[in-house]
């Protein structure tokens, strides 16, 4: 269920195939004007005018993503200039979310605009991991980290789990969701 409400391009396998990490979508909508990106060469901006949207009750959006085409554009070091080609080129840290305006923590140039001018608001990453023969759910992971911190708090989802290669992912496309095999 949790994977169904995650951003397709945020699903990735980490920690030597023992963790499946993802970023849950808590809201989304359309932005009104194109955002600055590597193609339009507009100046970096820290605000985005958006259509009315509501956030899922009980959640707290941490990030906004626009035009993501792979997990490498969603995770990694914060990067506010996609022209450099490294880091989270399609993710920005959200400072505030008003009904018609998203404010970022810093001005940003995005990797690309979304084809339909869509944005998604995301929670901090979560991960399912196989640790000590348990399937565990870790919340509040660091989007800048290359791996899941399995030393933190977790919820046990199942006991006596033994598999040699627990997770595999077939990346999503514009017209097909990500496929995860357990």
Model-derived regions, located:
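N-terminal alpha-helical signal peptides/signal-anchor transmembrane segments
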Residues: 1-11
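Cell-surface, membrane-associated systems
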Residues: 15-21, 26-182
């Amino acid at each position: 269920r949790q994977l169904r409400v995650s951003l397709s391009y945020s699903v990735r396998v980490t920690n030597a195939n023992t963790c499946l990490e993802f970023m849950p979508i808590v809201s989304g909508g359309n932005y009104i004007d194109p955002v600055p990106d590597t193609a339009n060469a507009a100046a970096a901006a820290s605000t985005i005018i958006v259509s009315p949207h509501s956030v899922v009750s009980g959640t707290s959006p941490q990030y906004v993503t626009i035009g993501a085409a792979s997990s490498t554009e969603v995770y990694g070091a914060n990067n506010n200039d996609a022209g450099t080609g490294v880091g989270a080129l399609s993710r920005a840290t959200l400072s505030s979310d008003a009904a018609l305006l998203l404010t970022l923590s810093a001005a940003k140039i995005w990797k690309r605009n979304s084809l339909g001018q869509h944005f998604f608001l995301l929670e901090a990453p979560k991960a399912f991991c196989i640790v000590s023969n348990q399937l565990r759910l870790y919340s509040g992971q660091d989007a800048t980290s290359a791996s899941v911190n399995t030393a933190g708090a977790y919820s046990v989802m199942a006991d006596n789990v033994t598999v040699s290669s627990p997770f595999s992912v077939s990346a999503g496309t514009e017209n097909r969701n990500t496929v995860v095999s357990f």
